[in-house]
């Protein structure tokens, strides 16, 4: 069965393609001589005009379309990295802001590497921009790097920070903000941090998300596939990608999420 692009996606592609077309019609000057347009001259001299492009992963693409009011269903056919011209460079959208999504990666310690130790902390803002991403030196000897699933290797320890630094920096970032995560208590426990329950948005506990797993805790991979039509964690995990996927899931259901939180926090009225 052939997958067809939606009309919105076709319009977007058409608009992007129009931006790359160059008109080569000659222009007559006042003296009747033909002028060579700048774009044509640059092509003749093999000069490439400065044009910043960025390669977006499926998650980055989904965040980009959400930011630009394009339906997620319009990008469902995108399974590989593609190149898009970024829309603007709003510095405010790169600041931490009100909402932060966090995800961590772990390595194995202890006999046979069965116990877990923190090895990476990644935090992204509401728009998916990375505001913190550091590898962390485990406090115990690593017996299993779990690279196939964690993406962490011994080389990453050359640029890693101490556990104390990771804990302090994360704590400062999260203070006063709403924390979004998937089974976020695992990440908080690993950092020995706590966060007000009223300021936590956990995608693993959201009822509409749990409905696809018969009320059980769904995996982030399953949620991304079902609701975003995006395949994540294809090989090794990336805590940045996982944090972005979690934030995007929250953004798609933010109004309902916030309403459910208000309902949970609403105290029952006292009866006389």
Swiss-Prot record:
Q: Which family does it belong to?
A: Belongs to the REXO4 family.
Q: What is its EC number?
A: 3.1.-.-
GO cellular-component terms in the record?
Answer: nucleus
Q: Does the keyword rRNA processing apply?
A: yes
Tell me the name of the encoding gene. Answer: REX4
Q: Which organism is it from?
A: Debaryomyces hansenii (strain ATCC 36239 / CBS 767 / BCRC 21394 / JCM 1990 / NBRC 0083 / IGC 2968) (Yeast)
Query: Which cysteines form disulfides?
Result: none
Segments forming domain Exonuclease: 99-250
Report the locations given in the UniProt record: Nucleus
What are the alphabetically sorted keywords of the record?
Exonuclease, Hydrolase, Nuclease, Nucleus, rRNA processing
What protein name applies here? Answer: RNA exonuclease 4
Residue spans with biased composition (Low complexity)? 1-17
Give a short account of what the protein does.
Exoribonuclease involved in ribosome biosynthesis. Involved in the processing of ITS1, the internal transcribed spacer localized between the 18S and 5.8S rRNAs.
Q: Does the keyword Nuclease apply?
A: yes
Provide the residue span(s) of the region labelled Disordered.
Answer: 1-33
